[in-house]
């Protein structure tokens, strides 16, 4: 497969050196995010990738040994600094002195590469740490768990970072660093590749070299005892040489660290993932439908999407995705229109669209009538838009302009051309290019497939020069559109920041009653709630449930209760030992009178005792028979993933739920947009939107149920598994017919264990200020427009004092990054008061961004110019300092202009000390030790 794509921008110089290698010049000045965005400090990782000196411990002259290969790679890479071999067997190696021990080296190497037996690694790391080495690559394999821990213990006191063990090493081509035993070097480029698999590292290098693909960094994590995916994502997110990050993942261990780093990186540049190791282990041990459906791979899928990354299935797709995501800048439509001169290639594209989940547009009548004016009578009058093989160049232009007049009815346009003898393909391209240039004025996002070889080569080149994505085959183009659409959806999920506690209708759940019920169940030695208990939990969270009563295992008692409820009814077996009642004949529906109930109860007891003789029979549940016309059966559930913590499931329900396998997973917390996105990832979502004579279902009711389950998981850590199955829904609403809940006091659950930290609503407070209430709270995505108004109100001189240049306007993407923050590592407190219209008015913001290890955080503060001297800055800084101190941050720092007297005075009053900025007389550094007693005003 070949992908030929260039994206031409006026401020960029682009050279296509091969079909899959495109080199872009650095972005123009001023394209960096301007306000309150600080570069993350990745402690000592720069010593891994850009060291001043390197030692190869275990270097050898043996041609086929790891030490020999590593020495030749490092010594011959063109690295500018000194490279020291360490091996007591040699006096000279490659004509230079070889040192017997680490202590014999003339200086402390900034980076050490260790390729000696496992038993030697701990002592070597200890020696290197003592000498002052900042980073080590441990190639050695076979370390025991105890040895790995001892290695980390030896490295920790001096913050020496360790890559590995059991890894191939790393390559940083721009630094001419090849600290690996790979068989070939990597070309310089703009892609970073990070892999857990060593074998894949070498295979990928070979594959990429054949296609002239270059890399900024190429990293084998090995067993990632220290440096892991989270560290690499943090480092690469702010690396200016890296345009996209490619990951090969087999397992993830620290979910919150990974998600926090992934979300931060995905806000800056595309992050594309190949995830291997699909496992069914979780299904085998599951006691619920949700557990059986929530395999580890489904959860990882949900995590990748929620972090704004894109998952692909192969190495080939990895590079296709990297190419299209880094070059295609137009907004992608959620549907596609195909414009072609050939029916066959159009059908191929339509088939590919179905396979990739790319919906085709149904052409509107106004659009059809518009195209009727410029196309022959026998055109397809549908999608694909087939303009017939004899089309002259002007017909292509007319069709394109006709579609562009209806952008809302067209979506993304896929143009497919097959060469004909009627008109040269080059003439068609020349005629179309003026219509599609420049990109900023293009009405439609456009991707093309010029099918063929020499006959379309020049036409393809013309489109590439016009900044249009070009592919050889329709299937490739459709796959690219599918990737763009999935990526856009994931990026939309990335921008959501729901609180942990938020019901859809604003109501408050009865958390206390649920906690008491569950504590009573656990105290009794049970871990499964009865059906009535599970439904009581649902009712406490305002999830509608069917009327359900419990009776002893007696047919007469069941008949009497049924009469009180009213016929028709359903009876079910009540047993702690039976999870899926239908499997043992433990459910009978639509019983019309007392005689039916008696007969069903007797028969049910016989069936259950025969098929499950050891089960404890606690009685029956009797419930009203709910009949809803044209209703769908759904499942909503939750379980605890061992890595990512609580997860939520939605899908098609009923007894065949595991057979249908129409479900999707999401990580809590959920708000309404995230709940709707979860629903839309299933096939049953199309049925819920209505079809033929079936009206659309009440999707709001389903959304409310999903949000209620999300809040339940946050409020009650003891919930280990939950099934609401079926939840039936139609246009009248939703109601739960059955529910199961398993509880445990041993699982790490609740909001504190969410892989994505919820919006910290509990941090909001109101204080008295100038005779009025002042709200201090964390910023949230919904603040975007208020924050824009705040920034536009600032005085340019104040902005210069804080940001060192004057600028008040910004792009929406820049503004979004200020209000869509990751509360795991960043905090922004805003101060607000009501304006004359009762809306919140932002008066100031104090922001801090912490290192990944939370050792230090850099802060910034800015307030409205008319409020200088009002005490607002002190209030905001006090709030920020209390928060950072409370989460264990050690130091709070900032860089200020020397002339910024007002900020310096405030900082002094708060206990900050000033130090000079090296080589810069215009700025000073402010530092506050947070874990020391606060200075009193």
Each model region followed by its residue ranges:
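Catalytic-core regions of core metabolic enzymes
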Residues: 36-739, 747
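Long, contiguous binding/interaction regions
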Residues: 749-937
């Amino acid at each position: 497969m070949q992908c030929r794509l260039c994206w031409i921008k006026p401020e960029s110089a682009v050279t296509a050196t091969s079909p899959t290698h495109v080199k872009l010049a650095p972005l123009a000045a001023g394209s960096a995010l301007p306000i309150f965005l600080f570069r993350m400090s990745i402690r000592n990782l720069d010593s891994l990738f850009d060291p001043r000196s390197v030692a190869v411990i275990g270097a050898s002259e043996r041609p086929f040994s790891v030490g020999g290969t590593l020495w030749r790679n490092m010594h011959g890479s063109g690295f500018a600094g000194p490279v020291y071999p360490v091996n007591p067997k040699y006096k000279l190696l490659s004509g230079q002195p070889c040192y017997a021990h680490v202590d014999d080296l003339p200086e402390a190497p900034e980076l050490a590469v260790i390729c000696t037996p496992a038993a030697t690694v701990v002592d070597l790391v200890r020696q290197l740490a003592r000498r002052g080495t900042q980073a080590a690559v441990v190639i050695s394999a076979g370390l025991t768990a105890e040895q790995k821990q001892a290695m980390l213990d030896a490295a920790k006191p001096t913050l020496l970072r360790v890559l590995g063990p059991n890894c191939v090493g790393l390559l940083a081509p721009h630094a001419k660093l090849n600290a690996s035993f790979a068989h070939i070097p990597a070309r310089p480029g703009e892609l970073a590749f990070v892999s857990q698999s060593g074998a894949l590292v070498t295979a990928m290098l070979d594959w990429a070299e054949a296609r002239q693909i270059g890399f900024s960094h190429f990293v084998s994590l090995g067993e990632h005892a220290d440096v892991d995916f989270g560290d690499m994502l943090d480092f690469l997110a702010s690396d200016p040489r890296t345009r996209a990050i490619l990951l090969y993942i087999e397992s993830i261990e620290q979910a919150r660290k990974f998600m926090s780093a992934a979300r931060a990186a995905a806000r800056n540049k595309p992050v594309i993932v190949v995830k291997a190791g699909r496992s069914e282990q979780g299904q085998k041990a599951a006691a619920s439908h949700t557990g059986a459906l929530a395999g580890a791979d489904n959860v990882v899928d949900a995590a990748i999407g929620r972090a704004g990354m894109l998952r692909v299935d192969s190495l080939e797709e990895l590079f296709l995705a990297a190419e299209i995501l880094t070059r295609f800048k137009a907004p992608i439509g959620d549907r596609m229109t195909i414009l072609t001169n050939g029916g066959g290639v159009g059908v191929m594209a339509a088939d590919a669209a179905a396979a990739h989940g790319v919906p085709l547009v149904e052409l509107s009548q106004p659009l059809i009538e518009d195209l009727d004016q410029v196309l022959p009578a026998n055109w397809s009058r549908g999608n694909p838009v087939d303009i017939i093989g004899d089309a002259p160049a002007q017909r292509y232009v007319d069709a394109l302009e006709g579609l562009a007049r209806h952008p809302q009815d067209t979506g993304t346009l896929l143009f497919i051309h097959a060469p004909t003898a009627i008109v040269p393909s080059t003439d068609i391209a020349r005629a179309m290019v003026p219509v599609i240039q420049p990109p900023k004025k293009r009405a439609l996002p456009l991707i093309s497939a010029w099918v063929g070889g020499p006959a379309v080569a020049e036409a393809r080149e013309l489109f590439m020069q016009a900044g249009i994505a070009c592919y050889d085959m329709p299937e490739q183009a459709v796959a690219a559109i599918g990737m763009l659409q999935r990526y856009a959806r994931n990026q939309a999920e990335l921008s959501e920041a729901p609180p942990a506690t938020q019901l859809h209708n604003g109501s408050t759940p009865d958390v206390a009653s649920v906690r008491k019920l569950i504590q009573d169940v656990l105290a009794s030695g049970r871990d499964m709630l009865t059906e009535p208990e599970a439904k009581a939990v649902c009712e406490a969270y305002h999830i509608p449930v069917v009327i359900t009563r419990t009776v002893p295992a007696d047919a007469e008692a069941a008949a009497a209760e049924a009469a009180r409820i009213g016929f028709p009814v359903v009876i079910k077996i009540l047993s702690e030992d039976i999870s899926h009642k239908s499997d043992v004949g433990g459910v009978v529906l639509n019983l019309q009178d007392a005689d039916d109930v008696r007969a069903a109860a007797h028969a049910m007891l016989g069936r259950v005792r025969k098929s499950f003789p050891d089960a404890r029979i606690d009685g029956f549940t009797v419930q009203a028979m709910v009949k809803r016309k044209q209703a769908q059966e759904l499942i909503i559930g939750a379980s605890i993933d061992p890595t990512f913590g609580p997860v939520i499931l939605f899908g098609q329900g009923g007894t065949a739920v595991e057979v249908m396998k129409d479900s999707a997973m999401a990580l809590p917390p959920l708000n309404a947009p995230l709940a709707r996105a979860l629903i839309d990832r299933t096939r049953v979502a199309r049925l819920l939107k209505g079809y033929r004579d079936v009206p659309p279902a009440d999707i709001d009711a389903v959304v409310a149920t999903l949000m209620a389950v999300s809040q339940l998981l946050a409020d009650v850590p003891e919930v280990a598994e939950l099934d609401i199955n079926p939840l039936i829904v139609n246009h009248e609403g939703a109601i739960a017919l059955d529910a199961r809940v398993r509880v445990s006091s041993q699982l790490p659950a609740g909001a504190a264990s969410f892989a994505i930290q919820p919006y910290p609503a509990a941090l909001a407070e109101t204080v008295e200020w100038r005779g009025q209430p002042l709200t201090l709270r964390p910023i949230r995505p919904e603040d975007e427009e208020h924050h824009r108004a705040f920034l536009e109100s600032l005085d340019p001189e104040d902005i210069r004092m804080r940001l060192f240049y004057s600028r008040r306007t910004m792009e929406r993407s820049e503004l979004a990054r200020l209000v869509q923050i990751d509360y795991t590592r960043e905090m922004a407190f805003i101060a607000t008061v009501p304006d004359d219209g009762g809306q919140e008015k932002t008066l100031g913001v104090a922001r801090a961004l912490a290192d990944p290890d939370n050792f230090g955080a850099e802060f910034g503060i800015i307030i409205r110019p008319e409020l200088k001297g009002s005490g607002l800055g002190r209030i905001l800084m006090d709030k920020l300092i209390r928060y950072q101190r409370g989460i264990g941050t050690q130091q709070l720092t900032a860089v200020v202009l020397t002339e910024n007297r007002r900020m310096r005075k405030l900082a002094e009053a708060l206990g900050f000390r000033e130090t000079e900025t090296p080589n810069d007389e215009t700025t000073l550094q402010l530092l506050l030790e947070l874990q020391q007693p606060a200075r009193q005003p």
